[in-house]
From Swiss-Prot:
GO terms for cellular component: cytosol. Keywords: Isomerase, Magnesium, Metal-binding, Phosphoprotein. It comes from Mycobacterium ulcerans (strain Agy99). NCBIfam families: glmM. It is an enzyme of class 5 (isomerase). This is Phosphoglucosamine mutase. The active site is at S102 (phosphoserine intermediate). Binds 1 Mg(2+) ion per subunit. It catalyses: alpha-D-glucosamine 1-phosphate = D-glucosamine 6-phosphate. GO terms for biological process: carbohydrate metabolic process; peptidoglycan biosynthetic process; UDP-N-acetylglucosamine biosynthetic process. InterPro entries: A-D-PHexomutase_a/b/a-I (IPR005844), A-D-PHexomutase_a/b/a-I/II/III (IPR016055), A-D-PHexomutase_a/b/a-II (IPR005845), A-D-PHexomutase_a/b/a-III (IPR005846), A-D-PHexomutase_C (IPR005843), A-D-PHexomutase_C_sf (IPR036900), A-D-PHexomutase_CS (IPR016066), Alpha-D-phosphohexomutase_SF (IPR005841). Pfam families: PGM_PMM_I, PGM_PMM_II, PGM_PMM_III, PGM_PMM_IV.
């Protein structure tokens, strides 16, 4: 058996790679690990999902695995990933399980496990769970020792009370378009923004199990741009399928990505004395423009590998208060143990109201260098990335760029892709060099 856990839990095409049998085994193995690491006593796991059709099947299988090993399953239903992380701590549960493939297409699904307090698992714990999956379930409890299933009727309301803490001023007078990606934020996202006082125009908020992320949400911004312009809104916020991301568009329909959002929030927190050690944590994918803006403001930037788990690790290690990714995963440990798209949207709007400035004006503190990202589908990521022809193409591009840009080649942790990213002083050079490297990757893969 190959490694199950990727950079963001276990993912695959539902009912093909990620089967009900595997979901049951993961539930049982996670329960076994908990028993072996915490000793005797009744244990509880929070279980949530996004609305994709396969989630019902996988939820049932995960819960069967948990209860078969004596763990009570607290079922919270369709809620964002950060809600499950928060509720794991709020309910004083032993761990949490989220069934979602985030921004991936509908046929995919995934299983993400949170430890106590809603924190992501470390590699050692994931390895232990994998070894228990391989070993099989072992002895099972019987009678009253079998776990029970409890529906948490107040889960959404608890989460909404939590996210309301992100909004330190009323948003009355602000008009926002919210793209829910037909995903987990479809109910709670608009409710959160309305509760804060904003006038909300919701789009793509009618999930049917099949339409999640379908030409909508944070990976397809055409609809929200059009809606912002059509309604004369102050901004738009777009979430992905599990609502751990937030991207924005300003009143002109222009993108405000995760880098620009981090700059806006970092400056706000620095002004309020809330930016711990005057430090922002981000990944190698962040635009050079972010680094320049932060340097000008006297903010340090700590850089990690790609993936919010690495951002989270650095935040915890340094006791920092803000980090994130260009893709819109923004983490504020004071407001949650993982990225929360709704919290991010509320903080962004709070800054607009507090300053009286438009989103375009706030985001203008960062000047984005032209950046081109090409996703290349490959059969073998390791072989393609290491191919001499690919390395030669990268060397040629780096020679041309010199110190005026950079190139990054990164295998995806969740999909059969290699991401080619090029930043350059002008758009033409970025496109040309990215295409030349992507062509080499495609030929090698």
């Amino acid at each position: 058996m190959g490694r199950l856990f990727g950079t963001d839990g276990v993912r695959g095409v539902a009912n093909r790679e990620l089967t009900a049998e595997l979901a049951l085994a993961l539930g049982a193995a996670t329960a076994q690990h908990l028993a072996s690491s915490t000793g005797p006593g009744r244990r509880v796991a929070v279980v949530g999902r996004d609305p994709r059709a396969s989630g019902e099947m996988l939820e049932a299988a995960v819960i069967a695995g948990l209860t078969s090993q004596g763990v009570d399953a607290l079922r919270v239903g369709v809620l964002p990933t950060p809600a499950v992380a928060y509720l794991t701590g709020a309910y004083d549960a032993d761990f949490g399980v989220m069934i979602s493939a985030s921004h991936n297409p509908m046929p995919d699904n995934g299983i993400k496990i949170f430890g106590p307090g809603g924190h992501k698992l470390d590699d050692a714990t994931e390895n232990r769970i994998e070894s228990l999956v391989a070993a099989g379930p072992g002895l099972r409890p019987v009678g009253s020792e079998i776990g029970r299933v409890i529906d948490a009727e107040d889960a959404a309301d608890r989460y909404l009370r939590h996210v309301s803490k992100a909004c330190t001023t009323r948003l009355d007078g602000l008009t926002v378009v919210v793209d829910c990606a037909h995903g987990a934020a479809s109910e709670v996202g608009p409710r959160a923004y309305r509760a804060a006082g904003a006038r909300v125009i919701e789009i793509n908020a009618d999930p049917n199990g099949l339409n999640i992320n379908d030409d909508c949400g944070s990976t397809h911004l055409e609809a929200i741009r059009a809606a912002v312009l059509a309604h004369g809104a102050d901004l738009g916020v777009a979430h992905d399928g599990d609502a751990d991301r937030c991207l924005a568009v300003d009143a002109n329909g222009d993108l405000v990505d995760g880098d620009a959002i981090m700059v806006v929030l970092a400056l706000a927190m620095q002004e309020a004395g809330e930016l711990a050690s005057d430090t922002l944590v981000t990944t190698v994918m962040s635009n050079l423009g972010l680094h320049l803006a932060m340097r000008e403001a006297g903010v340090n930037v700590r850089t990690t590998g790609v993936g919010d788990r690495y951002v989270l690790e650095e935040l915890r290690a340094g006791d920092y208060s803000l980090g994130g990714e260009q893709s819109g995963h923004i983490v504020m440990p004071g407001l949650g143990s993982t990225g929360d798209g709704i919290v991010t949207g509320l903080r962004l709007m709070t800054r607009m109201v507090a300053t009286g400035a438009s989103l375009a004006a706030l985001a203008s503190r960062m000047q984005t260098l032209p950046q081109v990202l090409i996703n290349v589908q490959v059969t073998d990521k390791a072989t393609a990335a290491a191919a001499p022809s690919v390395q030669a193409a990268v060397d040629r591009a780096e020679t041309e760029l010199g110190d005026t840009g950079r190139i990054l080649l990164r295998p995806s942790g969740t999909e059969p892709l290699i991401r080619v990213m090029v930043e350059a002083a002008d758009e033409e050079a970025a496109h040309r060099l990215a295409t030349s490297v992507a062509d080499a990757v495609s030929a090698a893969g």
